[in-house]
Every structure is written in C-alpha cells, then in structure tokens.
A protein has these predicted regions:
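A glycine-rich dinucleotide-binding beta-alpha-beta segment and adjacent secondary-structure elements
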Residues: 96-169, 176
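Short, low-complexity, polar/charged sequence segments that are solvent-exposed and flexible
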Residues: 52-58, 165-167, 178-182
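Glycine- and aromatic-enriched mobile tails/lids
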Residues: 28, 45, 157-158, 165-169, ...
Length: 190
C-alpha cells in the first residue's frame, strides 16, 4: 500500500507526490500512481516551467494547497465535497481540500488524464471507479534538452548524456534504461 504526501517547491508552491512503503506498519489499503501529461510547446512559447508553475499556483489559490476530487465527481462536472469523499470506498491518505480539478487543469491535460484512467480500467478494473481519488496537482519541472542524437551521444564522439540530466528522460526507470542502452552501445563499439 501507499500514501500521498505534500511537496513544497522552491517557489513556495505546494504540489502532491506519493510514497510506497515496504514495511507493513506504514502500508495502507491504497495504491497510488502519477499520471503525467507532457506538453511540448511550439514557437514562440519558451517558458514551459512557468506554465507548469502557473497551474500549480492556480491549484493552490483554489484549494489553499493540494486539491482532491473523486473521479465520479470529475466526470459529472461537480466539485467533490468532504461528505462524498468520507462516504467513498477509498480513504484519503492526505489532508487536501475537496475541489474541482477541471477548474485548475487545462482541457487537453485533463482529457489526457481521463483517457488514461479509462485505459487503465481495462487492465486494472476499478481504476475508473467513482470513488477513485485524484490529487492535484503534481508538476514536474524539467531542464532544457541537451543536443544529442538517437543514441544519446553528443556532437563530441564518445560523450553520451544519460538520465534526467539529458532532458530526454523523466523518470527513474527511463533514466536507468538510458544508462543500460548507452552501456550496450559502448560495448558494441569496442
């Protein structure tokens, strides 16, 4: 089981994150996962981190911090209430303000999250249950991408950039996989 937690950014913005625990004493009945929707902007827009920060600030303004919403309420176009959350099957693991994430998240991002919840429901039935709790927002701030080729190699022969520092990967599993990939490429070239 796992639980949600609060994360403060360096700019005083409160966002959400999750933890999974190995020890039985800290486990809950819940499972948590993040649904991250990447947005790649075209010219002339250049401040994707500022865009993400403004979404997080809006969430903080509307909810005084992290917002929680039942999936069923989101799909019915209504704000969640403490009463509906308390009556639900899923017990919250984070003190958050019941609210309406559709007032915070841009439509394309919200549509991507909803689409993914329904896709997950096909392989993990119950994911799209009315009582599923959505906490928001979680915003990832990524660095600029380093100029690399399809093999993660820079213009300097033999200099590879792997992991999240490359600006290409955005998770521990992707970062690890990029390291394995480059190691295999180097061995192959020996």
């Amino acid at each position: 089981g796992s639980e949600m937690c609060i994360r403060d950014s360096t700019n005083g913005i409160v966002t959400v994150n999750g933890h999974s625990y190995e020890g039985a004493e800290k486990q809950t009945e819940n499972t948590n996962f993040a649904l991250l929707v990447a947005k790649h902007f075209s010219e002339p827009f250049k401040d994707s981190n500022g865009y993400g920060e403004s979404i997080a600030r809006l969430s903080n303004m509307l909810g005084g911090g992290v917002i929680v919403q039942r999936f069923g309420d989101l799909m019915r176009g209504r704000r969640s209430t403490e009463k509906r959350i308390e009556e639900g099957l899923v017990k919250p693991t984070l003190a958050a303000t019941p609210g309406d994430l559709s007032l915070v998240l841009p439509k394309r991002i919200l549509d991507g999250i909803i689409e993914m919840i329904y896709a997950l429901d096909k392989i993990a039935p119950g994911t799209a249950n009315d009582d599923t709790l959505l906490y928001g927002v979680e915003v990832k701030f990524y660095n600029m991408e380093v100029e690399i080729d399809n093999n993660l190699e820079t213009r300097y022969k033999g200099l590879y950039i792997i992991g999240d520092g490359s600006g290409v990967t955005h998770s521990l599993s992707h970062a690890s996989a990029s390291g394995v990939y480059v190691a295999r490429k180097i061995i192959e070239e020996m």
